[in-house]
Amino acid sequence: EMCIRDRNGHYALMSREAAKAADKGMIVVCSAGNSGAGSWKKVTPPGDAENIITVGAVTKRGELAPFSSVGNTADGRVKPDVVAVGLNSDVMGTDGNLRRANGTSFASPIMCGMVACLWQACPKLTAKQIIDLVRQSGDRADFPDNIYGYGIPDLWKAYQSTQR
């Protein structure tokens, strides 16, 4: 069983492997986990890894989804990094019909798509530069916390900051 002190990004194999991928120049985007309403509450591996984007879930009004896991890491890093819609997310069901679903696993691909678009628009930037842009474009970037992280990113703002 994992203890709080083990959530340092170096204990769990998944976290170490995610950090390795990030160190090789990949952008790893992962969900924070859905333990926010339980007794554990904390971001689960590999969400505690260094140099990755860990995504929590919010409502369409920007309020924290009650199930969204929170940080911080054992070594004091802010997690989740950012948040995206994960409560009543519009998703395609296995039957091909649109439906609603809940989870940080739905917030994460939304963020992944936005990050991919930003990197495509700014191909000369490194993975770590893109991650920093995403964080700094968040609506809570001035005062990040362990609930919303850097907040809801504005990737148009992030893109525009590279065009100056």
Please give the residue ranges for each predicted region:
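Structural recognition of alpha->loop->beta junctions
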Residues: T44-K60
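Secreted peptidase-domain scaffold signal
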Residues: G33, A158-R164
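Flexible, small-residue-rich helix->loop connector segments that border functional cores
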Residues: A37, K60, N72-R77, L118-K124, ...
